Amino acid sequence: MSLAKASLWTAASTLVKIGAGLLVGKLLAVSFGPAGLGLAANFRQLITVLGVLAGAGIFNGVTKYVAQYHDNPQQLRRVVGTSSAMVLGFSTLMALVFVLAAAPISQGLFGNTDYQGLVRLVALVQMGIAWGNLLLALMKGFRDAAGNALSLIVGSLIGVLAYYVSYRLGGYEGALLGLALIPALVVIPAAIMLIKRGVIPLSYLKPSWDNGLAGQLSKFTLMALITSVTLPVAYIMMRKLLAAQYSWDEVGIWQGVSSISDAYLQFITASFSVYLLPTLSRLTEKRDITREVVKSLKFVLPAVAAASFTVWLLRDFAIWLLLSNKFTAMRDLFAWQLVGDVLKVGAYVFGYLVIAKASLRFYILAEVSQFTLLMVFAHWLIPAHGALGAAQAYMATYIVYFSLCCGVFLLWRRRA
C-alpha cells in the first residue's frame, strides 16, 4: 500500500477523530471559557503522554518488529507474546503509581490537590489506552490501514458518547475524565477488528517472554520515557510561565490555536505510523531509504503548507465554529503557529526514520534538542509577548529543528 492510499484510509478515521476532538474542545470552551480550557491543557497533555507511555511505550517497536517478521510465524509469536507481557506489567505498574501518587500528580497538573479522585480513575483508564494501542500497533505492523481506521472511527464515536455522559454527570471533573475515556475505549473495536481480520491467532496474545526481544523493545520504552519528560514537560512549563506572567486566560488563548493546529495536522501525520514506519523498517539500503524519505517530504510539505494556508484563511470562522467569541484574540497567533506546523511535520519524517532504525542515540538527541529550543525561545518571547510569544517560540523552535534534521540527514547519507 502506498503512502497516498494509506493517507486516504486514515483520512476517514482522522476526520472522525478530529470531529470528536473539536466537539470536546467546543464543549470545554463554551462551558468553562479560556481559563477552563487552559487549566485542562495540562491534563490533556497527560493523556497524550499516556498514549505514548502506557503499556511500556513499545508500540512503535511492536509495529516495527511485526512488519519485520510478518512472514515468520515463530518469531512473530515471540514478538506478540513478549509485547503482551510488557504491556500487562507496565500498565499495572503505572496504575499503582497513579493511585499512590495521586496527590503530587494533581498538584503538578492543576496547582492543587483537589483532583486526586480523577487521577485515581485515570489509573484504571490508562490500562485501556495501553491495550488499545497494542492492538492498533499490531494492525499497523501488517499495514492494515483499513482495519486501523475502522477501529479508530468506532472507538472515537463510543468515546464521544462516554465523554458526554461523564460531562453531564460530573461537570468539569467529569469532562476531564471523558478526555481519557476517548482513547481508552478504542480497545473495544480494535479487539473485534483484530479477531475478524485473523492475521494472528488469539493465542499469540498470551503473555510470554523472550529476553532478546524484550531487550530490543526496551529501547522503545526508553524512547517513550524520554518523550514523556521532554516535550510534554516543556509545554507544561511554558503554560505555567505564561500563567505566571499573564493569566490562565492567556494560556487558554494559546491552547485554542494549538488545539486547532493539532486537529488538522492529524490528517497528515496519521498515515505515518501506518505506512512510513513499517516501510522504513523493511528498507536496509541507504539509497532506498533516501528515496523513501525524499518522496515522503515531497508529499508531506506541500500538503501541510496547503492545509495551513487554508486554516489561516478560515481562522475567524474556525474560532467562531470551534471555540467561542471569547477566543478572538487568538487570531493573531495563527500565522506563527502554522509556519511552525509545516516544519514540525517535515521533521516528523526524519523522526520516523530514527524510530524505524531504533537509533536510541539520535532519538535522545532529537528530543533534547526540541526541549532545549522550546525552553530558550519561550523564556525569551513569552515574557515579552504573552500568548503570541508562545506561538512565536513554537515557530522559531521548528525552523531551527527542521534545519538541523536536514543537515544531519545529509551527513548520514554521505557517510560510507
Curated annotation (Swiss-Prot):
One of its GO terms (biological process) is enterobacterial common antigen biosynthetic process. Keywords: Cell inner membrane, Cell membrane, Membrane, Transmembrane, Transmembrane helix, Transport. Signal peptide: none annotated. It is found in: Cell inner membrane. It is a multi-pass membrane protein. GO terms for molecular function: intramembrane lipid transporter activity. Disruption phenotype: Null mutation results in the accumulation of lipid III and cell death. Probably part of a complex composed of WzxE, WzyE and WzzE. This is Lipid III flippase. It comes from Escherichia coli (strain K12). The lineage of its organism: Bacteria, Pseudomonadati, Pseudomonadota, Gammaproteobacteria, Enterobacterales.
